[in-house]
From Swiss-Prot:
Residues binding heme: C437
EC assignment: 1.14.14.1
Catalytic activity from the UniProt record: an organic molecule + reduced [NADPH--hemoprotein reductase] + O2 = an alcohol + oxidized [NADPH--hemoprotein reductase] + H2O + H(+)
Organism per entry: Mus musculus
Cofactor section: heme
Task performed by this protein: Cytochromes P450 are a group of heme-thiolate monooxygenases. In liver microsomes, this enzyme is involved in an NADPH-dependent electron transport pathway. It oxidizes a variety of structurally unrelated compounds, including steroids, fatty acids, and xenobiotics.
Protein name from the UniProt record: Cytochrome P450 2B19
Major subcellular location class: endoplasmic reticulum
PTM annotation (Phosphoserine): residues: S129
Domain of life: Eukaryota
Gene, per the UniProt record: Cyp2b19
Protein family according to the UniProt entry: Belongs to the cytochrome P450 family.
Tissue specificity as recorded in UniProt: Expressed only in differentiated keratinocytes in skin.
UniProt keyword annotations, A-Z: Endoplasmic reticulum, Heme, Iron, Membrane, Metal-binding, Microsome, Monooxygenase, Oxidoreductase, Phosphoprotein
């Protein structure tokens, strides 16, 4: 639905909602400063047509690193800059550990699952998920072995093209999805499996829809716009279809479950469900299982595959960087064995390049919303319990106080004077604090092993001259996606 139509709908209903709102109790607390809101519409008129991120960055310049924006009728506190975000999410981690609502997802997730829950439910599910993923990551077939095998499958597929140009999106989706599938479902899929391809298409389409302007406007006025057509309905339809597949998979697992030999995340969860079946207050029930699997599958597929897509577009844009990475690969690994995770500490330049790709591309610029779990005093302001808080991760990843050239791609941001990898507190593509991304470790391992294996086996070429390659993302909302492109993988 067009922005102008959405705005008209909001305006025509705003007055009635305003009248109703006057009879509601007023919010207590002392919020950070921000633009003066209109009744019901909030700060809609201060929103940039380019999206929420652009709007928030402009408001940061005027109001500082902590400010309040009314997204429709509700106040949301914005946290900008490295120091501010760390002070809230790390130093006051418990107070800021609640999960805010993502309006386009809420009809499906409804506060369930390991990513979208809060309080004791979240703590219980996160402890279980971390332990389970760690156990399967360090067992007989470790995550590293799975990634290496998948990387080899990819190399064989790319060799079939014999240097012909291709769009790498499909293959990057397949390899990343297969890793999370092996952990959650206990199996990997052939790249031609119709069910697998359909699931990948649903995830890709949903991710793109969530980045649209329509979805961003929906976050402001979901209470009204949920009754009208829009991207939110397709998102719910897609997610429900994925949930149906997960539910079917859970039933197959239940029918073939061997308590002495759990195969994957689902088996382990089912065993825990059985153990706690007499506990009427347990969080280990079907709803939390399917939403947790949906969350892990969705979050563990699209963000990492999109990072890989951007990685090789950047390598085409800056071929001298790709050449330096390949030189380091040749020196440390050579051509006769697979890259391993142990190689990472011996390859500071490659590691710095991957860090810089994540920083520069900034794929989740706003991050998932938080919510304060109690009345919270922060920098002299009293933020009332249950107020939503947005950590603007982009403002840290592009923080000029921490990065010399924040808007340029420069691996030197992560190298010291001796060429060794250096840490940077502003590097938080996975967020930070207690709600840091559950799959951070797996994602980092995937990026290193896939990136190095591809560059070990192939040189890169583009049908377009480097100076004409566009790195500007298609969307700059809650998520970013790179432009579509063609690439030649030339066997080395």
């Amino acid at each position: 639905m067009e922005f102008s139509v959405l705005l008209l709908l909001a305006l025509t209903t705003g007055f009635l909602i305003f009248l109703v709102s006057q009879s509601q109790p007023k919010t207590h607390g002392h919020f950070p400063p921000g633009p003066r809101p209109l009744p019901f519409l909030g700060n809609l008129l201060q929103m940039d047509r380019r999206g929420l991120l652009s709007s928030f960055i402009q408001l940061q310049e005027k109001y500082g690193d902590v400010f309040t924006v009314h997204l429709g009728p509700r106040p949301v506190v914005m946290l900008c800059g490295t120091d501010t975000i760390r002070e809230a999410l790390v130093n006051q981690a418990e107070a800021f550990s609640g999960r805010g609502t993502v309006a386009v997802l809420d009809p499906i997730v409804q506060g369930y699952g390991v990513i979208f829950s809060s309080g004791e439910r979240w703590k219980t599910l996160r402890r279980f998920s971390l332990a389970t993923m760690r156990d399967f990551g360090m067992g007989k077939r470790s995550v590293e072995e799975r990634i290496k095998e998948e990387a080899q499958c990819l190399v064989e597929e790319l060799k079939k093209y014999k240097g012909a140009p291709l769009n790498p999106t499909f293959y990057f989706q397949c390899i990343v999805a297969n890793i999370i599938c092996s952990i959650v479902f206990g199996e990997r899929f052939d790249y031609k499996d119709h069910q697998f391809l359909h699931l990948l298409n649903l995830i890709y389409q949903t991710f793109s829809l969530m980045s649209s302007l329509s979805s961003q406007v929906f976050e402001l006025f979901s209470a009204i716009l949920k009754y009208f057509p829009g991207a939110h309905r397709q998102i719910s339809k897609n997610l429900q279809e994925i949930l149906d597949y997960i539910g079917h998979s859970v039933e197959k697992h239940r029918a073939t479950l061997d308590p002495s030999a759990p195969r994957d995340f689902i088996d382990t969860y089912l065993l825990r469900m059985e153990k706690e079946k007499s506990n009427h207050h347990t969080e280990f029930h079907h709803q939390n299982l399917v939403i947790s699997v949906l969350s892990l599958f969705f979050a563990g597929t699209e963000t990492t595959s999109t990072t890989l897509r951007y990685s090789f577009l950047i390598m085409l844009k800056y071929p001298h960087v790709a050449e330096k990475v390949q030189k380091e690969i040749d020196q440390v690994i050579g051509s006769h064995r697979l890259p391993t995770l142990d190689d990472r500490t011996k390859m500071p330049y490659t590691d710095a390049v991957i860090h810089e790709i994540q920083r520069f591309t900034d794929l989740a610029p706003i991050g998932l919303p938080h919510k304060v779990t109690k009345d919270t005093l922060f920098r002299g302001y009293l933020i009332p319990k249950n107020t939503e808080v947005y950590p603007i991760l982009s403002s840290a990843l592009h923080d000029p106080r921490y990065f010399e050239q924040p808007d340029s791609f420069n691996p030197e941001h992560f190298l010291d004077a001796n060429g060794a990898l250096k840490t940077n507190e502003a590097f938080m593509p996975f967020s930070t604090g207690k709600r840091i991304c559950l799959g951070e470790g797996i994602a980092r391992n995937e990026l290193f092993l896939f990136f190095t294996t591809i560059l070990q086996n192939f040189s890169l070429a583009s049908p377009v001259a480097p100076e004409n390659i566009d790195l500007i993302p298609n969307n700059s909302g809650a998520t970013k996606t790179p432009p579509q492109y063609q690439i030649h993988f030339l066997s080395r």
